[in-house]
């Protein structure tokens, strides 16, 4: 060793022992050094451990559906399709680095979902419950309020603002969230051909939504759109945001039926009667072209590869909605009554009567709360002032004729006057 080397000894990596001249870069710390090769090795270990953690946390499609079953009644096929789509989406998100390094030629596309079905059948609840199960931020938007930039209404970027706010302004967390856009059928274009005049709340909105649904670097105003023009914009990557869009699509069943019947033509074709098929049976057979004919532009339909439908809920389904989910309406009211030390009980006939009223109003599961509120109002008004009541029984007479419930007291049973 030369005298000069003794004065300036070569620095060594504290991990692998290589000298500073044997490596590309040596980073100094407090009394230690680490080379670029060891940094790369440490990074690989961290990524591998993170993937193992993610693999443990990532729910299987079966587990996702089981969790959905706790909150959503019926819609078995829709829950199964959503579970697979969501599982694949987050597998794509969490394993992005592994996929790009091991399968560089394979690019996994987003599994955005379209839910078709009548109002009150559980579309919004499905999307909201998925976000709750996966513990990711969630935002709901109403497509009818959206317009192209520069027109009166909400810009499509405002949807991303809401997601960011719901993620407590954590950009990384927000960029892995779920956005549900309701009433998507209401922004269908008004004619089959391309729009000549400006359609700012129809085809124009579809065009504006295309990029953020597909995945883009969007500039979003953190305080919302036009009221704060001087604010700095935040760049959000939407590539890993799952978009679920839903709508009633009234009249889509006719388009599907026309296509199916149109296929049975010519010699040897089976001639069937004009018996109408059930709505659910028709919506099971929706093709992308049917949606285009309805008024969604082909590019928009192409960005949403997963199509599924939800059925109208039967009276039996609505009775189950009232009692089975973790946050069932009857359980909520029972909890309220418990706070007054009163047990609330609904007879099976009462539950059927409530479900029947919701069906009559054609509001589906959404109408159950309205029916319950109107029934329970007077009871909840009087009960806190009543002394000695330990149980309140609601039967079908209360539902159908606005009769009084049966109040059971500590010492005797009587009907409240």
UniProtKB/Swiss-Prot annotation:
<dbReference type="GO" id="GO:0005524">
    <property type="term" value="F:ATP binding"/>
</dbReference>
<dbReference type="GO" id="GO:0140662">
    <property type="term" value="F:ATP-dependent protein folding chaperone"/>
</dbReference>
<keyword id="KW-0547">Nucleotide-binding</keyword>
<dbReference type="Pfam" id="PF10431">
    <property type="entry name" value="ClpB_D2-small"/>
</dbReference>
<dbReference type="GO" id="GO:0016887">
    <property type="term" value="F:ATP hydrolysis activity"/>
</dbReference>
<keyword id="KW-0067">ATP-binding</keyword>
<keyword id="KW-0862">Zinc</keyword>
<feature type="binding site">
    <location>
        <position position="16"/>
    </location>
    <ligand>
        <name>Zn(2+)</name>
    </ligand>
</feature>
<comment type="function">
    <text>ATP-dependent specificity component of the Clp protease. It directs the protease to specific substrates. Can perform chaperone functions in the absence of ClpP.</text>
</comment>
<dbReference type="Pfam" id="PF07724">
    <property type="entry name" value="AAA_2"/>
</dbReference>
<feature type="binding site">
    <location>
        <position position="13"/>
    </location>
    <ligand>
        <name>Zn(2+)</name>
    </ligand>
</feature>
<feature type="domain" description="ClpX-type ZB">
    <location>
        <begin position="1"/>
        <end position="54"/>
    </location>
</feature>
<dbReference type="GO" id="GO:0051603">
    <property type="term" value="P:proteolysis involved in protein catabolic process"/>
</dbReference>
<dbReference type="InterPro" id="IPR038366">
    <property type="entry name" value="Znf_CppX_C4_sf"/>
</dbReference>
<protein>
    <recommendedName>
        <fullName>ATP-dependent Clp protease ATP-binding subunit ClpX</fullName>
    </recommendedName>
</protein>
<comment type="subunit">
    <text>Component of the ClpX-ClpP complex. Forms a hexameric ring that, in the presence of ATP, binds to fourteen ClpP subunits assembled into a disk-like structure with a central cavity, resembling the structure of eukaryotic proteasomes.</text>
</comment>
<dbReference type="GO" id="GO:0009376">
    <property type="term" value="C:HslUV protease complex"/>
</dbReference>
<dbReference type="GO" id="GO:0046983">
    <property type="term" value="F:protein dimerization activity"/>
</dbReference>
<dbReference type="Pfam" id="PF06689">
    <property type="entry name" value="zf-C4_ClpX"/>
</dbReference>
<dbReference type="GO" id="GO:0051082">
    <property type="term" value="F:unfolded protein binding"/>
</dbReference>
<feature type="binding site">
    <location>
        <begin position="118"/>
        <end position="125"/>
    </location>
    <ligand>
        <name>ATP</name>
    </ligand>
</feature>
<dbReference type="InterPro" id="IPR003593">
    <property type="entry name" value="AAA+_ATPase"/>
</dbReference>
<dbReference type="InterPro" id="IPR003959">
    <property type="entry name" value="ATPase_AAA_core"/>
</dbReference>
<dbReference type="InterPro" id="IPR046425">
    <property type="entry name" value="ClpX_bact"/>
</dbReference>
<feature type="binding site">
    <location>
        <position position="38"/>
    </location>
    <ligand>
        <name>Zn(2+)</name>
    </ligand>
</feature>
<feature type="binding site">
    <location>
        <position position="35"/>
    </location>
    <ligand>
        <name>Zn(2+)</name>
    </ligand>
</feature>
<dbReference type="InterPro" id="IPR010603">
    <property type="entry name" value="Znf_CppX_C4"/>
</dbReference>
<dbReference type="InterPro" id="IPR050052">
    <property type="entry name" value="ATP-dep_Clp_protease_ClpX"/>
</dbReference>
<dbReference type="InterPro" id="IPR004487">
    <property type="entry name" value="Clp_protease_ATP-bd_su_ClpX"/>
</dbReference>
<dbReference type="GO" id="GO:0008270">
    <property type="term" value="F:zinc ion binding"/>
</dbReference>
<dbReference type="GO" id="GO:0051301">
    <property type="term" value="P:cell division"/>
</dbReference>
<dbReference type="InterPro" id="IPR019489">
    <property type="entry name" value="Clp_ATPase_C"/>
</dbReference>
<keyword id="KW-0479">Metal-binding</keyword>
<keyword id="KW-0143">Chaperone</keyword>
<comment type="similarity">
    <text>Belongs to the ClpX chaperone family.</text>
</comment>
<dbReference type="InterPro" id="IPR027417">
    <property type="entry name" value="P-loop_NTPase"/>
</dbReference>
């Amino acid at each position: 060793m030369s005298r000069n080397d003794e004065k300036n000894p070569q620095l060594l990596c504290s991990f692998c022992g290589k000298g500073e001249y044997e490596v590309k870069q040596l980073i100094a710390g407090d009394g230690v050094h680490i080379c670029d090769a060891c940094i790369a090795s440490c990074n690989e270990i961290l990524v591998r451990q993170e993937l193992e953690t993610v693999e443990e946390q990532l729910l299987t499609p079966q587990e996702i559906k089981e969790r959905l079953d706790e909150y959503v009644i019926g819609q078995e096929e829709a829950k199964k399709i959503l579970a697979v789509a969501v599982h694949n989406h987050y597998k794509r998100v969490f394993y992005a680095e592994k996929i790009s390094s091991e399968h560089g030629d394979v690019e996994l596309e987003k599994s955005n979902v379209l839910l078709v079905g009548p109002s009150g059948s559980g579309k919004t609840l499905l999307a909201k419950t998925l976000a709750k199960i996966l513990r990711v931020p969630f935002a709901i938007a109403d497509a009818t309020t959206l317009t192209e930039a520069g027109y009166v209404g909400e810009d499509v970027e405002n949807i991303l603002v809401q997601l960011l706010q719901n993620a407590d302004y954590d950009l990384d967390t927000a960029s892995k969230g779920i956005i549900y856009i309701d009433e998507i059928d209401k922004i269908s274009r008004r004619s089959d051909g391309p729009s000549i005049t400006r359609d700012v709340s129809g085809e124009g909105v579809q065009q504006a939504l295309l990029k953020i649904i597909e995945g883009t670097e969007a500039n979003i105003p953190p305080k919302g759109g036009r009221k704060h023009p001087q604010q700095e914009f935040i760049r959000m990557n939407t590539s890993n945001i799952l978009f679920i869009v839903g709508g009633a699509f009234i009249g889509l069943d006719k388009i599907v039926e026309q296509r199916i019947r149109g296929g049975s033509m010519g010699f040897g074709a089976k001639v069937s009667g004009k018996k109408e098929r059930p709505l659910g049976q028709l919506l099971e057979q929706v093709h992308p072209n049917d949606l285009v004919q309805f008024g969604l532009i082909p590019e928009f339909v192409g960005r949403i590869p997963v199509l599924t439908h939800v059925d109208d809920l039967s009276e039996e389904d609505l009775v189950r909605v009232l009692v089975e989910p973790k946050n069932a309406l009857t359980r909520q009211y029972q909890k309220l009554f418990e706070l007054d030390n009163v047990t609330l009980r609904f007879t099976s006939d009462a539950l059927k009567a409530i479900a029947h009223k919701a069906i009559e109003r054609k509001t589906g599961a959404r109408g159950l709360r309205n029916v319950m509120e109107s029934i329970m109002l007077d009871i909840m008004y009087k009960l806190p002032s009543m002394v000695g009541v330990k149980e309140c029984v609601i039967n079908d007479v209360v539902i159908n004729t606005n009769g009084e419930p049966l109040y059971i007291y500590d010492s005797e049973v009587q009907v409240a006057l």
